[in-house]
Amino acid sequence: FTVLLGLNGAGKTTLYSLITRLYNTAKGEIKIYGNSLSKDPYQALKNIGVVFQQPTLDLDLSVNENLMYHSSLHGMKKQLARSRIENELDRIGLLEKKNTKVRTLSGGQRRRIEIARSLIHKPNLLLLDEPTVGLDIGSRQTILKHVKNLCKVDNLAVLWATHLIDEIDKGEKVVIIDKGKILEKGDVESIVKRNKTKNIREAFNKLVKI
């Protein structure tokens, strides 16, 4: 579990757009598990799941219809897709909402559905771009706890982009970004020590000159 920490406009969403090929670049190269994104995008992208900052669920479809559509994009057989969908919905405590229209769900529930959707094809890496933005504290904590648990249970690598420092726990790895550049990276204790501050909040404020 690694936190990509930066203010709004720091470049977090741009980085995710480059990784997912929403943006193309003529310079540099991105590799995912050794696979070149430009030369072999299918192999590179098949191992990642993404939860974008902007909601991407179809509000007029049911939860199941949304997830079945996503599974079809990955070429999954219907029987396997149904099994995985039920499993992921059960893990996030929303199995009973399977046939419910997405429009009727709360913001926190929709976010959890998007996380479930991102895991159906069993990725090795999960990218989340400000997944708790606009949610109440209870929903934020539920989502954060679930994703951190996925790291342990599924051995899943997670890159969690946020501007909320209180989502970082001691011992976690952090990459601090500002204006498209990496200012610091390492575990919380190391970053605090190198910047001669009392905590990660002070270190962050010092680095981005708040």
Which role does the model predict for each range below?
Residues L126-D129:
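Catalytic Walker B motif of ABC-type/P-loop ATPase nucleotide-binding domains
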